Amino acid sequence: MDDAEVDHTKPIPAYYCCYLLRSTKQRTSLYIGSTPHPARRLAQHNGESKGGARKTAKDDKRPWEMVLLVEGFTSRVGALQFEWAWQNPRMSSQHPANRHQFDLETGDVAGTSGVQPSTEAGKAKHRGRGSRRSLKAHLEDLHLFLRSTYFSKWPLRLRFFNRDVYQLWTTWCDRVDALLPEHVRTILDGDCPKDHLSWADEPRVGSVEHIKVDYSDIYDYVEKSHFLLDDPSDLRCKICQAKIALSEELALVCPRASCYCISHLLCLSSRFLDHAEEPEQLVPIDGICPLCNKVIQWSTMMQELSLRTRGHNEFRAILRKAKRGRAKAHGSVHEASAPDGVASAVENPGSRAACVESASVGVSDSLDVDNHDDASLDENWTESLDLDPNPDELLNRPKDHKMESSRVEIIIDDSDCEEMEDLG
């Protein structure tokens, strides 16, 4: 299945992650999954709400805890691909045991990665350091996949909630010579120690229940872009200085609140790639804004662009919510509609009927993830999804793949086929 056929019909999701689950009663029992709503998914695993998975339903292992999240996925398909690779390292093409490509920086073909080449991927077992189902093994595989050819180009970040898991992670990072890509951030949360790794723009939330899974982090950004692009008669690209025709070209707005830089998507991406550390990089990760000279994240701009161009209901809901927020802060809708002219852009001229129609869609329903994302899947769901794409074949994929839309909706939903590891 072509990823584009799935991802290009909806905006980039507000949040999607892969997670590592651990039993609090049998700490050797582990479970890998993916979800757009960690708190809801954890409640399902613990039997507090309907859903969950058959392998986490045993009372002798509940309650479960999410000890680690891999965040930043820009599509559900991408999260499922990473989930599958993490569950099945011996079958993933990104694992050196299968691709026969070994990281020379480790200086150890088999010992450092913890696996040995085998012609029977998925069946061979390495007896040198114990079962591949241990927490240590999962963290080693995670480190390997984050620096693999395919996943190392993704804007991912790690969020640790448990001190012991983070300590085991740092022990492995100190041991292995290969380094993670610089853009892969580590966020220490839960009972992890506070230190310089706690990024200012990625604050601690304390627990899984407090993770934001809607678009609230970019409400102001969405409203600003709507205001700046509301009058397309005289929009000019900051890079090429040419006029921007919004009906024919895609435009990007700097996500920084005090910056009003507008540019062509192609102009800005070319500029970012020209200054990228890796010359063969195809998609930017971040770059310097040509106006404010601050580092801005490419994924954030793509999320706003996808909302503006493909998520019309979500986009209008964000604008309505922002308007009501200002009205509440200033005491009246009239007072909230005046400052800086931004509020005047909330109601799109000529689209009054569309706004009225969209008002029937609840803001929470539009901005939150669908409840179907946690629906149970049949046992053969992986057969219909290309979970292990070969990077060498990505550019040669046929463009006219046909698929059953009803099946796609099931496939890309939150996986109930995650893997549980039980050493007890």
Curated annotation (Swiss-Prot):
GO biological process per UniProt: double-strand break repair via homologous recombination
Biased composition (Acidic residues): 381-391, 411-424
Keywords: DNA damage, DNA recombination, DNA repair, Endonuclease, Hydrolase, Metal-binding, Nuclease, Nucleus, Zinc, Zinc-finger
UniProt zinc finger (SLX1-type) residues: 237-292
Gene Ontology MF terms: 5'-flap endonuclease activity; crossover junction DNA endonuclease activity; zinc ion binding
Residue intervals of the GIY-YIG domain: 14-99
Biased composition (Basic and acidic residues): 394-407
GO cellular component term of the entry, any: Slx1-Slx4 complex
Subcellular location: Nucleus
Chain intervals for the UniProt region annotation (Disordered): 36-59, 109-132, 381-424
Reported cofactor(s): a divalent metal cation
EC number: 3.1.-.-
Class of the enzyme per the UniProt entry, highest EC level: hydrolase
Record bears the keyword Chloroplast: no
Family recorded in the similarity comment: Belongs to the SLX1 family.
Role, per record: Catalytic subunit of the slx1-slx4 structure-specific endonuclease that resolves DNA secondary structures generated during DNA repair and recombination. Has endonuclease activity towards branched DNA substrates, introducing single-strand cuts in duplex DNA close to junctions with ss-DNA.
PANTHER family (alphabetical): STRUCTURE-SPECIFIC ENDONUCLEASE SUBUNIT SLX1
Binding partners and assembly: Forms a heterodimer with slx4.
Name under which the protein is recorded: Structure-specific endonuclease subunit slx1
Organism: Aspergillus niger (strain ATCC MYA-4892 / CBS 513.88 / FGSC A1513)
Gene name of the record: slx1
